[in-house]
């Protein structure tokens, strides 16, 4: 699910404070 994936990405990026993806 793309929505779930986006949610996970947001949480991870917030945790790491580093966007490891570009789109």
Swiss-Prot record:
Name the enzyme group at the top EC level: hydrolase
GO molecular function list:
metal ion binding; phospholipase A2 activity; toxin activity
Please give the cofactor(s) recorded in the UniProt entry for this protein.
Ca(2+)
For the biological process aspect of GO, one term held by this record is: lipid catabolic process
Name a GO CC annotation attached to this entry.
Answer: extracellular region
**Main subcellular location of this protein, as a coarse class:** secreted
Keyword Disulfide bond carried by entry: yes
Post-translational modification summary for this protein: Contains 7 disulfide bonds.
- What other note does the entry give for this protein? Negative results: does not show myotoxic activities.
* Protein family per UniProt: Belongs to the phospholipase A2 family. Group II subfamily.
- Name of the protein in its database record: Basic phospholipase A2 mangshantoxin
Q: Which organism is it from?
A: Protobothrops mangshanensis
């Amino acid at each position: 699910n793309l929505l779930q994936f986006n949610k996970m990405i947001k949480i991870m990026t917030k945790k790491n404070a580093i966007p490891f993806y570009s789109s």
